Amino acid sequence: MPVGVDPHEVIASADGKTAYVTNYGGGSYHELNVIDLVAQKALPDIDTRPLFGPHGLVFVNGKAWFTAEGSKSVGSYDPASGKLDWSLGTGQDRTHMLFVTADAKKIYTTNVSSGTVSILTDTLIQPGRMAPPNAKPRKDWTQTVIPVGKGSEGFDVSPDGSQLWTAASEDGMVYIIDPAAKMLKAKIDAKAVGANRLKFTPNGKQVFISSLRTGDLFIFDVASRKEIRRLKIGRGAAGILMDPDGSRAFVASSADNFVAIVDLKSLEITNRLDVGPVPDGLAWAIRP
């Protein structure tokens, strides 16, 4: 399927009929590419201006949510109206990846060059003391910025929502945040230098970290916070996708043009899929 000249991340709609692709351009492009997965054809692109550099991408609550790295922002696109319907600035450098809770009330982002994680919360603000007598509460968004390591990019929130793990590419450290307390709780010297993506397994018991620099896949036990396995994926491990049924993980090897399949019980590479050049972002498309 034809997309833009610099596709990075991909996501499918909840009904599995439409895919969205961010066309990144190092923060300078302004396009979401759209694909009809049923007819297998490209649909008209979405112009994200004034938001530039769309990268991280999720589909939640009927909308496509994305980071806009070049504009230090996040935004959302509503397929029902065909419009960009919301945006919020982070003020952080290289707002790159994001996670949106199922109710779309909280958004997490990694800000790579700032070395921070943003927690954006949809909040009901109560009237202040100087407000008129008939003033009503109003909705607004608040931001909590948590310092982590420089180069923190890949991250994930545990299935139960109790932990956020992110890995810093520069020093290979893993930072663990309590989302409820909005505080850094722990650091792990994971030695995952070049960390690119991080994903919890569907049961929440392991964390997978890919290294684009070394081609390794680091597997950590969540309870003990210890490395339990390390697999050589190829010359550069990138995107990670978990099978929702908990049986497999798919890991893109960008430098080798294949996607490795890892069995989640044995934690062994069982197969690989030869794909096009420089695979990176991966997504499930599930149709009822």
Task: Give, region by region, the residue ranges found by the protein language model.
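Predominantly soluble domains enriched in secretory-pathway, periplasmic, or organellar proteins
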Residues: 1-288
